[in-house]
Amino acid sequence: MNYIDLHVHSTASDGSFSPSEVVELAKNAGLSTFALTDHDTIDGVAEAITHAQQIGGIEVIPGTELSCYYGNREIHIVGLFVDYQDAVFRKTLDDLKQAREERNEHMVAKFVAAGIPLTIEELKHGNPNSVITRAHFARVLVEKGVCKDKNEAFDRYLGIGCPYYLPKPKVTPEQILPLIQQAGGTAILAHPYSYKMSRSEVEHLLDDTLIPLGLAGMECYYSTYDNGQTQELRSIAYARNLLVSGGSDFHGIVKPDISIGTGRGNLRIPDKLLNDILAYRSHTA
């Protein structure tokens, strides 16, 4: 059996390895396929696909992880097999990136005004095209000795309700799901139990909002889920004829306990899930 990972990040957003390095890591981990799903960008996809073709033995699925709001909760939708060369799709993602950058500049100003010097250059850390997230702020706060680790950074400075937190401009599922579909992608709800929602709340999210908008699947395999959670999510998905997906959410140094393909050591995602996604795409094309 071959194994896959359909949720992976690189330096194109808040990962710590370049797209080419991620390809090498995926191949060395024995994966047959992985999806590069950086936050609100597809900027690393071309590099990853090119490098995979050069070294052979590994396939790259073009993807992205898009943030949106369900009420006051931020949720993430992974788009798999998006057309990363589509001009309209790229323009929309560039607009989302610009909105993030404006938010980041305001957050930097809040830190500086409080006597904690941060710069955008420090956040980008030699990757000028990266999409900056709060994880970048956490890294710099730890490097400067302001916080002992990223958990403290989020608890004291960056979490919702903390003094330096600023929300991103609110994008809705009604905007994100059609965007993925228009780019030829397959929309997957990422890590549904990471939003502090009960099973019934997840089911309402699916039934009332996401499925009517064209959601195709849900991540049921994930680095922090035990077998019971995975099976529960699989049952929710199958009851609604949703695809079952899975991914490690690998970031590298940012999440040092999570390895590509295996998560915290007990994650194995069979390629049958990818075959099911491909079959779905062939029937809906």
Per-range role (PLM):
Residues 46, 237, 264, 277-278, ...:
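Generic low-complexity, intrinsically disordered sequence content enriched
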Residues 51-208, 267-285:
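Extended substrate/RNA-proximal surfaces in nucleic-acid metabolism proteins
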Residues 1-73, 158-159, 171-255:
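An N-terminally biased module of ancient metal coordination in phosphate/nucleic-acid-related enzymes
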